[in-house]
Amino acid sequence: MKLAARHPEIVEKLIVIDIAPLPYGNRGHQDVFQGLFAVNAAKPQSRQQAKPILAQQIADPSIVQFMLKSFEPTSPEFFRFNLTALFNNYENLMAWQDVSVSVPTLFIKGGDSPYIKPQDSERILQQFPNASSFTINGCGHWVHAEKPTFVIRAIERFLNKNECV
């Protein structure tokens, strides 16, 4: 979203998956960080070894599975992302300053997710006047992991026809 605001000349269309352009503060990701750092400390050599370590900290099995997709035993922090940098910059990542984005934008929301609420619509349209939205029922925040076929179909329709899906 920030890239589209800062450099609209290089963004033709924008797709945002289950996040609203507003500050989130602490959204309860501490369990995820604790699980990831526990894996880092235990130094497992396989996903099978990492899974129970994550599951001790993260109650939702779908989040455990999603985190395991980035597990890489040969990486310095055992994941394909910089865990320390994410943790150290978490507050900055969760903060938000309003922007103005005119490119066509699709917001995809998980039907059971708390990340985009009905009351957020006005603030979204103030910042993204060319926005449309699509809700995928029966999934939460990890909509792209829970219902990838529906997400891909929504993205394809938006990119190919510039229509609200």
Predicted ranges, named:
Residues 1-45:
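Flexible "cap/lid" loop of the alpha/beta hydrolase fold
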Residues 5-9, 126, 153, 157:
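Short, well-ordered alpha-helices that flank and scaffold nucleotide-derived cofactor binding pockets
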Residues 75-127, 132-135:
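Conserved serine/cysteine hydrolase catalytic core
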Residues 19, 110, 138:
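Cofactor-binding loop segments of dinucleotide-utilizing enzymes, especially the Rossmann-like FAD-
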Residues 131-165:
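Catalytic active-site module of serine/aspartate enzymes centered on a nucleophile-bearing elbow/loop
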